[in-house]
């Protein structure tokens, strides 16, 4: 319609609420039907947008350092698995790692962070980070972006990689209610 290279049109940034896809008739005419309103044309933001999102949602520096460490570890695993033929997107996983704790200071932060990313127009990333605190039943046996982010988070204490036992030993004293202790036990078993 505008003479743009169709192979590069997804590089055009759109604000939340923009239209990502317009369907045309077989003869090239516009039907007036569109899909994916409010969805960014790319699955994940670049690193500059990640920083701006972290700024917008007031993510403290110590949490950003943790997110960066999780992102590095998850990305390393994803690159190796991709080479072995697994259907994993290393850059999507790295970016999800950089934003997985965007709502860390809120209750039920994994779901709150997923809501933020959906609102910002990144529903695929939202689906990945909403499970970084606990996977859905049976999901822990697969190798997906969701399971890799979950495990990388469980093997990262603050901004350093640790084994799972140490990570859960260190976090256990923070669980002061029966529900928190049960959630901790379930996460440990999934990891």
Give the positions of each predicted feature:
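Hydrophobic packing residues in well-ordered alpha-helices of helical domains and bundles
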Residues: 14, 63, 67, 184-187
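Acidic, low-complexity terminal tails and accessory targeting/binding regions
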Residues: 3-51
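Charged phosphate-binding loop/patch that engages nucleotide di/tri-phosphates or the phosphate backbone
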Residues: 178-191
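Buried hydrophobic packing segments
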Residues: 2, 73-78, 113, 117
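Histidine-centered active-site/metal-ligand motif
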Residues: 1, 38-41, 66, 100, ...
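Active-site flanking loop/helix segments enriched in acidic
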Residues: 48-67, 96-102
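Divalent metal-dependent catalytic cores for phosphoryl transfer on phosphate-bearing substrates
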Residues: 82-178
């Amino acid at each position: 319609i505008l003479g743009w290279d169709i192979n590069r049109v997804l590089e055009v940034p759109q604000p939340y609420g923009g239209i990502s896809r317009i369907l045309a008739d077989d003869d090239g005419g516009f039907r007036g039907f569109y899909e994916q309103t409010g969805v960014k044309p790319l699955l994940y933001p670049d690193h500059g947008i990640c920083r701006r999102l972290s700024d917008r949602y007031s993510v403290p520096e110590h949490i950003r350092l943790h997110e960066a460490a999780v992102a590095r570890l998850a990305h390393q695993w994803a690159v190796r698995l991709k080479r072995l033929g697994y259907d994993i997107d290393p850059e999507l996983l790295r970016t999800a790692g950089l934003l997985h704790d965007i709502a860390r200071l809120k209750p039920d932060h994994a779901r709150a962070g997923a809501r933020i990313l959906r609102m910002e127009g990144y529903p695929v990333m939202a689906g990945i980070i909403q499970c970084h605190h606990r996977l859905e039943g049976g999901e822990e046996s697969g190798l997906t972006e969701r399971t890799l982010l979950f495990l990388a988070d469980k093997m990262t204490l603050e901004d350093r990689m640790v084994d799972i036992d140490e990570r859960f030993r260190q976090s256990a004293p923070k669980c002061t209610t029966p529900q928190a202790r049960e959630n901790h036990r379930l996460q440990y078993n999934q990891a």
